[in-house]
Amino acid sequence: YADYALFIGTSLYGVIEAKKYGQDISTNLDQSKRYALNIVPQDGADILGDWNGYKVPFLYSTNGREYLQQIATKSGVWYLDVRQKYNNSRSIKGFHSPEDLQKKFEQDIALANKKLEENSLDFLQLKTGLSLRDYQIRAIQAVENVIIHHPDLNRALLAMATGTGKTRTIIGLAYRLIQTNRFKRILFLVDRTLLAKQALDGFKDYKVDDLKSFSDIYHIDGLKTTWPDIDSRIHFATVQSMVKRLYYNDVEDKALSIDAYDCIIVDEAHRGYLLDKEMDDEEMEFKNQDDYVSKYRQVLDYFDAFAVGLTATPALHTTEIFNKPVFNYGLREAVLDGYLVDQDPPIRITTQLSEEGIVWEKGEKPTVYDKEGNQIVELEELEDELKFDVSGFNKRVI
């Protein structure tokens, strides 16, 4: 007998193989598959279909332990949609809600993939629309190829030089993914409010199809929206706000389900800090680059969603999350194609200040700015030499 059966009304949607805490989980869900093969309907229970002998579409296996990559076979909720032979089991953050399971069952992925593969992209190059260039079309096709032909991969990275039109490219991609119903809702994730506003303006202003913008055709939720509307097709949010909603939310009945978004777009996926860079208030919410990567990875791991990363400069931590870029269009190629202008070699100007820094000798009395009193005050005599190098200028020296 199955450990748990998931019914919505009288219809059987899933079975769960429950293991003891810490016990090995069969990541290929062998036991759940046996349950699904040997199900016998009775007492008015409805079987939704038969898929290669399996009489239930969604299978789960878990031991109650939160997923840890280091002990993959001993943690997490493992899930498999048996309706397509090419589907592989994967670890997810939790169980799908009844509403999510119904939507998953109603969604025809095979048909959506067929539309995505067969529908022409020519309209994206029209002057009355996005007017995309050839390399932008190739970028879209590269991501779509992963979605259609590599269902075992759930992430893709686009590397495109600054100034080559990443925003227009992603608008074209998002439109096709929504138009074909391949995904029902996209989360557009950024680390700064300004980036979100710039991208949102693009979705509102750029014409996509039939002289209409994305926002003219589909409903968009902006940064002020905490919980996406039921008819929302794309939702803009910062990493900071999303982490708070997912992991520091006290309102249990408003917790986002793992299927609230089935596609996530991460803008500026490389994300890094410079030692002498002044951080704004939003950036200060992250301790450092590692803290930022950790947090946006938490968001990616929470949702059962395909993720697309956008970057101009793929860093090691970026490829560790998204794998190697599925499409590259660098500065040199853009210059040769005539879309960007090459830069001259940098001229480095050195000064005594930048070379030697600022030094106060022992016995001197340095001055500091008193924020509370809004005045310059003199300190006591220094007991030892005090030196600031270039990296400390922006943060500690006026």
Regions found by a protein language model. Name each.
Residues 207-248:
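Inter-Walker segment of RecA-like/P-loop motor cores
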Residues 161-162, 270-271, 288-318, 338:
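Conserved helicase ATPase motor motifs in RecA-like P-loop NTPase domains
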Residues 319-398:
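Interdomain helical connector at the RecA1-RecA2 junction of SF1/SF2 helicase-like NTPases
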Residues 60-61, 235-238, 265, 305-311:
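Structural recognition of the conserved hydrophobic beta-strand(s) that form the central parallel beta-sheet
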